[in-house]
Amino acid sequence: MKKKNWIYALIVTLIIIIAIVSMIFFVQTKYGDQSEKGSRSVSNKNNKIHIAIVNEDQPTTYNGKKVELGQAFIKRLANEKNYKFETVTRNVAESGLKNGGYQVMIVIPENFSKLAMQLDAKTPSKISLQYKTAVGQKEEVAKNTEKVVSNVLNDFNKNLVEIYLTSIIDNLHNAQKNVGAIMTREHGVNSKFSNYLLNPINDFPELFTDTLVNSISANKDITKWFQTYNKSLLSANSDTFRVNTDYNVSTLIEKQNSLFDEHNTAMDKMLQDYKSQKDSVELDNYINALKQMDSQIDQQSSMQDTGKEEYKQTVKENLDKLREIIQSQESPFSKGMIEDYRKQLTESLQDELANNKDLQDALNSIKMNNAQFAENLEKQLHDDIVKEPDTDTTFIYNMSKQDFIAAGLNEDEANKYEAIVKEAKRYKNEYNLKKPLAEHINLTDYDNQVAQDTSSLINDGVKVQRTETIKSNDINQLTVATDPHFNFEGDIKINGKKYDIKDQSVQLDTSNKEYKVEVNGVAKLKKDAEKDFLKDKTMHLQLLFGQANRQDEPNDKKTTSVVDVTLNHNLDGRLSKDALSQQLSALSRFDAHYKMYTDTKGREDKPFDNKRLIDMMVDQVINDMESFKDDKVAVLHQIDSMEENSDKLIDDILNNKKNTTKNKEDISKLIDQLENVKKTFAEEPQEPKIDKGKNDEFNTMSSNLDKEISRISEKSTQLLSDTQESKTIADSVSGQLNQLDNNVNKLHATGRALGVRANDLNRQMAKNDKDNELFAKEFKKVLQNSKDGDRQNQALKAFMSNPVQKKNLENVLANNGNTDVISPTLFVLLMYLLSMITAYIFYSYERAKGQMNFIKDDYSSKNHLWNNVITSGVIGTTGLVEGLIVGLIAMNKFHVLAGYRAKFILMVILTMMVFVLINTYLLRQVKSIGMFLMIAALGLYFVAMNNLKAAGQGVTNKISPLSYIDNMFFNYLNAEHPIGLALVILTVLVIIGFVLNMFIKHFKKERLI
């Protein structure tokens, strides 16, 4: 057994040695000629030096212009013929420095443009252009690269000085132009204030004067009116309207006499009718019938008292007899008879269903109909989605919710139709899965085909027509304001003179007091204004008639009118919506078909289950046969319930006695009432006495009334004349009040127009003040720090003379003449291979000798744990010693500078301890699988090394653990990144590896060896 184990150990050792030799050969082949490349670059021309440019500059703004000096620097280098420049990312540049692709990396920092444009700063910061040379270069190559960077930097500084001088000259030129613009704006504001606001305000008091004159005139007319009216009332005689009331006024109407005769005749007729009808009423018959009914009610009441007990006895006897009959009945079906009948019935039904041709034909017909229906439904859904060439309008666009809202639908409707589009997509995917590629279907791409169509407004436009007649004494100007969303074609005629429809102010002929205005033209929507127009869908055209630049005499009291003629056309009806209607109709049709499709989907054509049907029918019959006993018990319970409720039923039937008594009392009262009526009819009615002698008074009263009415008529004629005179005065007052109302309206319109003009002028003046303030603020900043007191600002002068300086990103390594430097890649590879050998030694020892027990387990139960701690400590200490030795050798080989050696040794020790602890744990715990994982990590590292190209790093480099270690050492040796985080991670991994080696679980039966 021991011999066999040593054979296994020997084979594994040979495999490791072969792998190590192969790896060393591969690395030497890949990286060993780096020094040779460096020596050849010395002998070749300078254009063999490759320089990587990393542009991290962010654009800035200076004097309102975008500045990107990083791009300008790159363009400057593009004109350089002696060297090869490439613009790459920082990762690509660092990889190129690592594998020899680039000799120099120049980094343009992100604040390069911002710091370069510090012309206004008092103490500007220097700009640093960072660069780094590759590790391990020859001294001559390094000197050449330094010279290249210095030359490029000097040329770029010269260009920056030219830019600074150009910027200063531009600022002075802009200041000159802005001062002229300020003067022009001030002159325009003053002129507009004089013509647009000051002159109308001077004329404004005239409106108050006209209003005062009209109000005084109206007040005089009203006073005259009231005086005339009072005079008319005072001159009237109060006796004129007094009527003699000694007579009965209610009888003065001439028709009263005839009306009295008519009423008298009607009363006589009514008395005759009453006498004739009372003899025809037969009250005796009604009275006798009611008495007979009362007698019958008495007989019925006596019968109820004697028959109640007989009813109860009869019901009880019948129920007892029925109970005996039911109890004597027995079930005609025995248990055996039921089972035989079940068997025979089952066989009979099976034979009938199996040989029933009609049933089979019906099932086949149903199956064929279902298949045909499904085929037709799929074809209909296909036609609903797919657009046929040229003629088809019933297809579905691939529209979103936002597309529906843009087409004019509200949010609820948009959600509804968006859900239908999703159903169409779902069905499309299901259909394409079942069909070959050539028969696949898709929704039609949407490109605003159903959006609100404004093509007619763009191509044909909308007619603009208006006719208006304006009367005014002081209108002398027309201001036209057009809708900015439209192009207007046509003209405006004012008293026959034509003017184009455009934004303008037109001076009118003041000799005319009436203006006939005719607007006739076409407004076409601008293509670039379509989106703004759809917000309100209205076209506006304003014609404002008013007064401008009026110079009147001081005593001129004419009023000023402002007439606003505005045309607003809502063009919502001109937007085509046919395509939207067709699309919504197509979606609704698809929704209906898809619902039928989902209802029928999943129904499989299963064979008709004859057995289930037969069992159901047989079970129903057998249940009826077996339920005889249960039915018998239920009937007996019903009979018992009827017997219990019989007394209540009889009582309900016989309880009508109370109602009968009440009816008898009502009939007796009715008989008494009819007896009284009969007595009343037997008496003769008394005729009323009517005094007809009063009719003579009507003639005397009418004669006196005629005299009084004649006298009133004369006085009313005089009153009518006075009223007409008052009406004339009232009309005059009304005219004065109307004129006063017009003056007030004109005053209001003029005040409103003046307010609008004042607001416009105020906005313009505020804008001018803002522009002037901005210019003054910006101009104040220009070279405000060019002097420090009375002396020149030396810091700014030094910055502008030499703004950009170079900064060398120093390496940790020291270049010793022509000595080559080993690559960190080979260094990491050697450490990992050494850790694999160490791990295998511990693993082989444990397999041959067993677990290391420094303390016997017999003395304490915790001694096993202490042995594990000591074992992990031995493994970790071995890694520490190996790391210290390897670190000292590598430090001398890399020629690490004095200030960086301690950190370098610490990094190597921690890395070696991680490698040894992790690899030892893998071999001790999972054995062959652990060896596979170790070799896999090594293989990933080889693949990652092979993929390191100037174009960037591959995915393999990101998942390779050894690549991260390689990058850590490379970045440290090049002084690129801090290593604090890396040291913390390595320390954590050392602790994890130490703990894992403490808890090795040994299995009794090992399978993976």
Curated annotation (Swiss-Prot):
One cellular component term from this protein's GO annotations in UniProt: plasma membrane
Localisation per UniProt entry: Cell membrane
Task performed by this protein: Component of the type VII secretion system (Ess). Provides together with EssB and other components such as EssC and EssE a secretion platform across the cytoplasmic membrane in the host.
Keywords: Cell membrane, Membrane, Transmembrane, Transmembrane helix, Virulence
Residue ranges of the TM segments: 7-27, 822-842, 869-889, 903-923, 928-948, 979-999
This protein's record includes keyword Heme: no
Topology of the protein relative to the lipid bilayer: Multi-pass membrane protein
Record's subunit section: Homodimer. Interacts with EssB.
Gene3D superfamilies: abc type-2 transporter like domain (3.40.1710.10)
Lineage start: Bacteria, Bacillati, Bacillota, Bacilli, Bacillales
Disulphide connectivity of cysteines: none
Keyword Cell membrane among UniProt keywords: yes
Native organism: Staphylococcus aureus (strain MSSA476)
PANTHER family given in the database record: TRANSPORT PERMEASE PROTEIN, TRANSPORT PERMEASE YVFS-RELATED
Family: Belongs to the EsaA family.
The protein's name in its UniProt record: Type VII secretion system accessory factor EsaA
UniProt main location, coarse: membrane
InterPro entries: T7SS_ABC-Transporter, T7SS_EsaA
